[in-house]
Structure formats: structure tokens, C-alpha cells
């Protein structure tokens, strides 16, 4: 008689326990155990419980290959969900096999778990295990299906595919309700307390292993509803017309002010702070160093001489590498939209900036169109106060549009959704890259589904607050993806290509490069452990299918993007995986977390403009300035969005935090510990530096970075 001792851990989440019958079957190289029910006195499998059981066999089973978990009806109780974290099996000789699960098991089904040792397909030779990999991926591909949102967009998850699966196909796929079509607007309606329509059906059905936890859902609602109702009760969400004075805008979120929001309110109109935001604001990726002026921006030395001073000139500063350009060309053909029944306007500015000898980045000249001429004056710091402020505000509006649509939603949310989908569809649970990437895909499918149901849907928040509306968003993102490259995606390459490696006080760059290096070192150790040679990379058919699917579905097979369609060496793997993890975590934090801080003072990030860009100088006053900014209700709706996306709901997992132990071998566990140690040192360095800054830069402090795109 051989006795196997099982230790079963149920997740600590709300409603994670089950009343259903749980049985197991152990499968080894020498046979399999009888199916045995796990039952003790009292309740089994309560949330957070760790319980021990024995499985008796007539003989030892050899090396354990699979553990089958059977979930079946118990008496008259309704079927429920069970979150199984892991099962540890102590064999008769005292050795321990770990079977990670970390998934919701719904309904009545059988789930097959493999030991936690990560294995590529090249390392599996037994037909039983090869068949298991094939069946697992086939089931996942039936559950997680691709869907086209709009031409030129990265493909997304089709929530229609979360349907009842046959019990013998349930590996991690346990949704039991058929979904309504995501594009069907029949459920697109207003809810009390929310200023926009919400596509309710698309929110109701989400595969349980990718949806928000109850804790996160409740936290999100508690962030959203009071803020929205508070503005509603004060009449702000319904008040149309211009703001009467600038100071009135401070009352929108009077109870949600931060140190940074106060700093922005005090310094927003200063040229130094305008330039600072290109380095450490929410869109720190726009600047390019230039050695000559583009023909479409005919700035002369005489125009900028008063700012440059007598000791230098424009040509000299160009040659020294001190002149930078922010070019919003992508907005030139963007369609515009009506808000409150009034036409809105968009500019496509060119903003020239200078790095002064004092190390400050300041604007030199602003042209509000891509076509120079008499109707497109070049605005200068020497112009009247209101002319210059209005020109800068137009640039800030362009910053808002490019940041929200491309830098933020396209390049983090949508691309990371494609990475998550390819990982779920092409890599089995036992694959080392699945184990590496899974924590960095947590909740991404859910948050993007929420975004499409509340922001991108017809009459959603994008239609309610932006000058380009939903159709303009589609144009911007499709155009942005068509020009997005692998160089843009990889932080060190992007900084080098933009010529911004030497700018002082560029905290996004400095912190980002440290985090990139820490991720790269971690990934290099993991890849080196599982992929010792070029051949081991090239022969991994699952890895190549994963890479090819990302290339086809995220980047639409565009060769000019420079993204890999297959991986040939461990070095190529390390770079690609490092970039994915960085963009799913640190890059998203950098472009998301500060939105309320920098946008709560509305003139610093207006979502729309009600007057066309000025064609002459000398006509702007305070009144015309206020009449150009968004109306009161538009401003409040947009600031509500800023507030929500900047408040990470509960159930957070900071970068490098891996409570789900998918890796069970000692080598990757040591690599994880080393990664966490590096991140802790980076955090200490950032906090020490911030003590000497007038405005601390905290968005890339590792404890404040979420592992994944989850809000």
C-alpha cells in the first residue's frame, strides 16, 4: 500500500470556497490512483483554508505526471465556483511535487494539473503530456478568440467566446453564460450617477480567470460613484456654458487635491513647468532632439533671440543639441466632433523647445498647424500674455489627445491585451514563458472590456468629453499603430533614437532605465535557465506560435514595424520579453498614474477646444480664453475620468510581487528574489532623490507600479 499525502490550498478571495464534491486522481509513469474523494469532518475548501488528505494506492505510481481534480455535485446544493491555489503531494519516499493551479473552477468538471516544473514542448516526449498540451491549448483557443474592433486596430478579445465548455475541455476555461455581442448597442444605456452611456451586456460576461476580483470591483465602484454623484449633486455635470473665472475650476475636486495638483495649479502657466511636463508629465515620450529646423516650421533667429540671449543663436543651439521638437502631425487630419451641440476644434501644433544653460527646458516657439503661412502665426514668449498662454493651452490640448489615445490606451492597454491573448492562446500552463508573463497580464482583458463599454462605446465618455469623439479616436489609434515601431516599444532604443539621453532632470528616463535593467536581468536569468542555446529557442514551436500571433494580431503583420515574427536566439527573447513586461507595468504606470495630478487643473489638460486656433495675434483676452476652454460639464466629466484611472483599486500587486507561485524550481525562485531586491534598491534611490525635488517624481517608484495594466 502506497500513501500519498495531499495539501490543498483554497484561495483567500471572497466566495473562493466550494460546497461541491472534490475528488482527485493521481497519474504517474507506472499507473494511476483510483478516483478518491477529498473529505474530512467539517467544511472542506473554505476560503483561505489549507487542508490535508491522504490518497491510498495499491502500489507506487512512479513519477507523477498529472493530477486530475474532479468537481461534482454535492447533495441538493447548487453548483458554485472554487478557487484552487495549489495542491502539494508528498510521495511515499518523502519527495514533494507541487501542482500550481491558481484558477477558478466553475460548474462540474475535471481539471488536469501538471507538476510545477516548467517545461517547453521540446522537453516533453511522453504522448500523454504532449496530448495534454495540445488539448489545453485547443480549449483555450476556443475560449479566448480574437475580434477586430476597427480596421487598423490591434485585435482584441471577443467576449462572445466565453461560453459553456464541455467538461472534458475544462483546463482553465470555466465560464457558463453565453455572451451578448460586444458590438450590440441594445444594452448601451445610462446608469444613475454616471454621465455617459455604458454598454452593459459586454460587462456582464467575463471568463472568471481574467475578470476583476470582488475586492477590486467593489473598490472601483466606491471610487467612481461618490465622485460622480458629488459633482452631480452640485450641478456641475449638467452645467453648460463657459467658466466664469479660472479660480472656479479649483472647486471641482476640492476634496481630492494632492501635493502635485496644488503645484500644477500654482505653476501651470509658467514656461519652465510647461517644458518640465515633456520630461516628467504623463506623456514623457514626445520630444525629439533636432539638428535643423523642419521646413514646415520657419522659425528665425530674430524671433527667438530675446530668449536665447546675446551669447548664442538658434543655429549654435541646434548644433549643440539643445533644441527639441514636439510635433503633433498625427492630429492634422483628425476628424472633429460636437459637444453640447457645438462644433469643437483640433490643432496639429509644432512646439520648439530649448534646453537652457540652467538645465531648464522652455518653449521657444509654437505654430498651431503643420502648414506655415499668414493664417498660421508663430507664437513666441515675447507675445502678449494671453496670446502666448492660449498657444500653450492648444499644445496641452494636443498633448491630451495624443497621450490618452496613443501613448496611453493604444501603446499600453491595447497592445498589452494582445500580449495577454497570445499568452493565453499559445502557451500552456507548464510553459516557462507562460509562468513568466501571466502575472503581467492580470486583469488586462477585464479593464479593456470596461474601457470599451464606458469610454469607446457610442455616447460613451470619449464622445462626451473630447473634441475628436469616438471616430477621431479610431483615426488616431489606427494611424498611430501604422507608425509604431519596435524602436518606440523598447525604452533604451526609443531614448537613443529621440536624442534625449543627455537632458538633465529627466526622471522618467532615469527611473525607467533602472527598471528596464532590473527586468532585463531577471528575464535573462529565466531565459538562460530554460533556453541554453539558439536551437532551444528555434525548436520551441509554442514560443514561435506565440511570437507569430503577436506579430499578426497586435501589429497586423506589418514588416515595417520591426517587431519580430519569430525569435531565433535567447538574446532576442530577452529583449522582447523585457519590453513586454516593462510596457505592461512601468510604462503604464508612467503614463497613467499622474493623470489626476496633472489634469485636475483643467487648463493644463483640456479635452476639447471650442474656438478654432487663432489666425492672428493680439486678439486673445481672458474672456476669449475661457470661451475656448471646454464648458463646465465637459470639464467635469473629463476630470471624473482622470480621477478614476489614477486611483488604483484594491487588490494590487506591485511590480515584482508574485504571490501565485507558478515557478517551483529553485533557480527561478532565486531569480525572483534577486529581482525583488533590485527593485527595492531602485525604490530607495528614487525616494532619496525625491527628497531634494520641488516636485517629487513618484510614478516609477516600484511599490507604486502595478504588475499589469489593470486600471
UniProtKB/Swiss-Prot annotation:
Annotated residues for binding of Fe cation: 408, 413, 588, 592, 711
Ranges for domain Lipoxygenase: 120-711
Record localization: Cytoplasm
GO cellular component terms, semicolon-separated: cytosol; membrane
Catalytic activity: a hydroperoxyeicosatetraenoate = a hydroxy-epoxy-eicosatetraenoate; (12R)-hydroperoxy-(5Z,8Z,10E,14Z)-eicosatetraenoate = (8R)-hydroxy-(11R,12R)-epoxy-(5Z,9E,14Z)-eicosatrienoate; (12S)-hydroperoxy-(5Z,8Z,10E,14Z)-eicosatetraenoate = (8R)-hydroxy-(11S,12S)-epoxy-(5Z,9E,14Z)-eicosatrienoate; (12S)-hydroperoxy-(5Z,8Z,10E,14Z)-eicosatetraenoate = (10R)-hydroxy-(11S,12S)-epoxy-(5Z,8Z,14Z)-eicosatrienoate
Effect of residue 237 to M: In ARCI3; no effect on enzyme activity
Pathway linked to the protein: Lipid metabolism; hydroperoxy eicosatetraenoic acid biosynthesis; Lipid metabolism; sphingolipid metabolism
Tissue and organ expression note: Predominantly expressed in skin.
Record key words, sorted: Cytoplasm, Dioxygenase, Disease variant, Fatty acid metabolism, Ichthyosis, Iron, Isomerase, Lipid metabolism, Lyase, Metal-binding, Oxidoreductase
GO MF terms, alphabetically ordered: hydroperoxy icosatetraenoate dehydratase activity; hydroperoxy icosatetraenoate isomerase activity; intramolecular hydroxytransferase activity; iron ion binding; oxidoreductase activity, acting on single donors with incorporation of molecular oxygen, incorporation of two atoms of oxygen
Domain PLAT intervals: 2-119
CDD domains, sorted: PLAT_LOX
Presence of the UniProt keyword Transmembrane in the record: no
Effect of residue 396 to S: In ARCI3; complete loss of the enzyme activity
EC number: 4.2.1.152, 5.4.4.7
Domain of life: Eukaryota
Entries under Pfam families matching the protein: Lipoxygenase, PLAT
One example of a Gene Ontology biological process annotation: peroxisome proliferator activated receptor signaling pathway
Activation and inhibition: Lipoxygenase activity is activated by 13(S)-HPODE leading to an active free ferric enzyme. The lipoxygenase and hydroperoxide isomerase activities are in competition and are reciprocally regulated by oxygen. The oxygen reacts with an epoxyallylic radical intermediate leading to an epoxyallylic peroxyl radical, which, due to its limited reactivity within the enzyme active site, it dissociates and leaves the enzyme in the activated free ferric state.
Cofactor comment: Binds 1 Fe cation per subunit.
Entry function: Non-heme iron-containing lipoxygenase which is atypical in that it displays a prominent hydroperoxide isomerase activity and a reduced lipoxygenases activity. The hydroperoxide isomerase activity catalyzes the isomerization of hydroperoxides, derived from arachidonic and linoleic acid by ALOX12B, into hepoxilin-type epoxyalcohols and ketones. In presence of oxygen, oxygenates polyunsaturated fatty acids, including arachidonic acid, to produce fatty acid hydroperoxides.
Recorded family membership: Belongs to the lipoxygenase family.
Disorder noted: Ichthyosis, congenital, autosomal recessive 3: A form of autosomal recessive congenital ichthyosis, a disorder of keratinization with abnormal differentiation and desquamation of the epidermis, resulting in abnormal skin scaling over the whole body. The main skin phenotypes are lamellar ichthyosis (LI) and non-bullous congenital ichthyosiform erythroderma (NCIE), although phenotypic overlap within the same patient or among patients from the same family can occur.
PANTHER family named among the record's database cross-references: LIPOXYGENASE (PTHR11771)
Protein name (record): Hydroperoxide isomerase ALOXE3
Encoding gene per record: ALOXE3
